[in-house]
Structures are given as structure tokens and as C-alpha cells.
Amino acid sequence: VYKLAAPCRLTDTSWIQPGKSAWEWWHKAVLEGVDFPSGNKQLSLQLYKYYVDWASKNHIEYMTLDAGWSKDYIKELCSYAKEKNVKIIVWTWASCAKENPSDWIAKMHSYGVSGAKIDFFERNDQIAMRWGKEFAERLAEKKMVAVFHGCPVPTGLHRTYPNILNYEAVRGAECNFW
């Protein structure tokens, strides 16, 4: 399918850097031995700085902030992460971004966010495929990466827009939580 997709539409891809990501959601942001509240109900700038420090120390390129991050501290966190050579990817519902993706992406870019993890497409039709293309194209305009989660199956769009780092379109290990 990859070779059947349209060739890359981006003139400059030098900014696209795949890599590992720290991610608080997998273990519900529970940290032991810290002197601040942790857990999914206690997400804070302090907690995310801890993760950024850990990612930096372990040469992990990204920190993915899943559901619950706040615009109240995202700009400060992105500045902090940049000093530590860690890039921030933020999670969002597809419905939050699809109404006007350019505005949402511009806002995230202004905060210093490096990418978006877009979730809950909740369909596998041409409309969802169009959303994916639109997200990838608009993110690329701001030199931001995309991670598609709960999305349609990959169809080669990452050839056209190589800023798509990952498709999480399978029923994977996270289903063990339910």
C-alpha cells in the first residue's frame, strides 16, 4: 500500500525525527518515591517536568502527554522540555481538532508543542481518511509530527506526509486495562 500512495508532498523533511517517547498514561502516571502528588487525577506541571527530566536523562526524544494535560502549563512545559532536548506531543480527541484543525494546530504550535497524538477517529471510512490527511498536512505546515491513535488502518499516507510517525490502529495491549 505504501508504494501506491502519492509520493512525499513535503519539500523539506529534515525536521522530521522519529524516536522513542515517554508516556505517562500506560502506568496511569503513578510515581513512587516522589514528593508531589502523582496519578492520572493529579496531572501537573511538576509531574510532567519529572517525566521530561527522565526522558532527557535516558535520551528519549519525546514526551507524550495523554488525556488530562492542561493549557494552563503547556507553554511553560514546552520551554522546559526544549532546554532538556525533549519534544512534547499532546493528545487530543479527533473531534476537538477536526472542526478547524488549522486553528487548533496553530494554537498548539504557539505553545511550543512538537506534535499531536490524535485519537478517537471512531470510523474507518473516506471521511476519516480525509481527516487524517488534513491533520497530517496542517501539522506539516507547522513542522509538527502526527501520531494517529484509534484511527483507520494505515493506507500509505505516511509516504505522502512522512511527519506521521505512527499509526496505533490495532487492538493492542492498552485494551488490557479494560
Region annotations inferred by a language model:
Residues V1-E83:
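Conserved structural scaffold segments of CAZyme catalytic domains across common CAZy folds
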Residues A67-W178:
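Aromatic- and carboxylate-enriched substrate-binding clefts and catalytic-loop regions
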